[in-house]
């Protein structure tokens, strides 16, 4: 606890930790109340033999009753075991809608253990303690479920089926379902365990019969049975809401059948269960109970028979007319749940040929066109820029920096952080001292323009190498000077103590020098001067740290001094997750390097920060369609941008979706944790981008839900798909890519994330979806529709034309036969003026693992194909091929 407290204290967030502890404690204390009542109930049962009773349970009646008691306990234990596993593994996932999460391989083992525990008398005595402890543990671990249910605000949106606010589905439904599950499993266990206790009193098992429980015990059993019935009624009532987010045929949510048949039956069942519970508690009401049980059985039989009959006789013959209002609601809700209702739609009819006017109009697009894919650039970095075996470039991110003083359009670059990979240390260097005291951090990063290459075909660099040998270069072809790069991208003090690679704990500063970076054949050493870490200078702090980590060597390490601190959770996603466990941190973080004036709170000259994308999501949004069979999300928001200092480890959380009810609820619980996006320094905000993880989901949903007419949606005639392309010899789906282009004839180009789309089972281009990233337009979506009466070639078709071109296929064949491997890069489809331009970079590498070099650029306007060493050269050749021949006089 001391280490956790000190860790939160470095962010001045110890109040958040204290509040979480208090929420867990309060949840556990509240859970003790029903447990206390259950204990009192069980102690009230009289286990002594019923001598006065003349009525006995014998034969099959005794067997059936005993089996019922055992079955009740097994069902209860199955629910409890599932909740324990889920609460321990990911307690916040309970907020997505409770479900038993027992793996199939675990189910037989847990069932066998539960059966042995129920049947073995000594173990059975321990079961009440196990169930009580489990309920308290689950309730405490589910503190986030209770907190969100209490604090989530009204959204102002009401679903039309049960007229509940959407916030009920997003935040309160899970809490109610978990509460009913805990109470039901506890009540079932008490009923089954108490009944088994009465049935197995000596000599009942040897005689295989026992006296019927006396009046006092019968009243207690009836009271618990009535409680079980009330809880079943509550679950039945709550299950009506679950109809709103389960797929029923073509409708993502409750359709005509659910409203006309299923929901009324469930409401009727709820009333009947409550009446039966009341009858169970009333004395001398055996006839009433039997009649209610008969009515309940008839209702269930009618429900199971009437539903398929109604579907077959009424719904199927007139499905479209009956389901139209529900389809409209499903389309509207799905589009809102994934922000497709924010899309601005436009149309674009490209001209068949590229003209000089198009080139002038699209100059800013062409001057920033990405020719380097991340994969070949990373491959080059790993061979030329890792510099030591223990350095690693885990990923490369596309970004933009204001490098050109002449233009308003930032230069698009690819930035890759050089992190320390401790698993790559030589075996003799993997000592405890080296791993935790010496090799503590990575250093530096590379920055490359996306649109140029060197004379050897390899990437050019604005920033390369590291330490005092760091090379900062301008680019004459782009008109960028060295001073422009130095001004926009600081490189000094580029030690990366926190990154995206998983790293062990580090102790710094100590009496041992830390490896900083290599300089020629020598090494440069340093001592950590940042503000991160848990102090371990005092012997009591060292004892706490050694206990926390299970590392006794911290107690005897002579290199630790009074200023030493323990650096833990150095993977930036782990760092954010520890502070905000309710956020989903899907996707890779990306590094930015910004000038001093724009940094958040920092105690050093550090300029490097990681941006981590935080998502809120739910699988219980009314009438919204799930993303896929493997992804149950029905609601998704990129609600938080987390900024982590790469040197000091500070974490700041900025709310990027202030209208999201989920993040508003969490901001009510932890107001000191969040800041508005306006509070983010502008120099960091200039590097924000729509995460591909969100954009991919939006593209997935748009493929069906771009259709807003329920009749067209029902017919399924207008479904889109992501086109295919061949990359490095494999056919893959076209991934969304960043381009700098003009939006809807605007004069200035913007940094866009673009995804082309084609009709299902057809390769023609039908639309684009673009996410805007700059300024006040951040997060806006633009859908560009292409004319349906004019076929526009899709990426797969253009790539086929490229491979069929005699000149190009001849060159590719010569390279392949010459011992080299041709790698066709990502095919980009970009708007240039009034024309579409298809651009494919071609890389060449040795068959035995050589460096990929950018060798050719292939361009096409959809009719003509040209290839050259450079993009301007390829465009010139394309225009020469498309220009009409000049008429000559006689």
UniProtKB/Swiss-Prot annotation:
Membrane topology term: Multi-pass membrane protein
InterPro entries (alphabetical): UPF0182 (IPR005372)
Location relative to the cell: Cell membrane
Any Pfam family hit: UPF0182
Leader peptide range in chain numbering: none
HAMAP family linked: UPF0182
Name this protein carries in UniProt: UPF0182 protein SYNW1212
Species for this entry: Parasynechococcus marenigrum (strain WH8102)
